[in-house]
């Protein structure tokens, strides 16, 4: 084989891979659009009247996750299953955002942390790497950390809306998250940096709870939490 033939063959490989990446990008753009729609829907809970609409907003968000499933089903057909991590960078950020959105919906519904397995069901993915197109553990953890930041914001807006029990629930939940993450030996630099932000979320929520206590809402808040 001549030198020119070698390079012609290599160009064929490069062109084929570029075609794959372009197909992936198209699907990822659709995923990003759907994620924005879900986020816009859920952001309404931060507004005064939004607290009364939480069940309705969560139900509507779950309908949008049906579209997410369709896009992810399409995405996994665009590349060989064994090359998941070769192209993972293309959808990593939007997938972390979708994990956060799924976790936010579940928290608003039940005030619990969604499991990785439950997220895979919501998104229509596999929980195990051996099965191909799966939810990477680090992507799940990143999404959970985004949730913590969102909940710290929600604790502040809850007080503005007159919901004084919610910040205490959020405080308990975020402190449990912090304890859980302390059990992990995080190697991923990006994940570790994001985890560093969790302590600020914890502090922010604690300040909200403390402010409620100073203002005399502590007994009322505690009683409301016990009732729930």
Swiss-Prot record:
Subunit structure: Ring-shaped heterooctamer of six TSN and two TSNAX subunits, DNA/RNA binding occurs inside the ring.
Name of the gene encoding the protein in the UniProt record: TSN
Family: Belongs to the translin family.
Protein name (database record): Translin
Subcellular location field: Cytoplasm; Nucleus
GO annotation (BP), single: RNA metabolic process
UniProt keyword annotation of Hydrolase present: yes
Organism: Pongo abelii (Sumatran orangutan)
Stretches the record annotates as Leucine-zipper: 177-198
Modified positions (N6-acetyllysine) in chain numbering: 187, 199
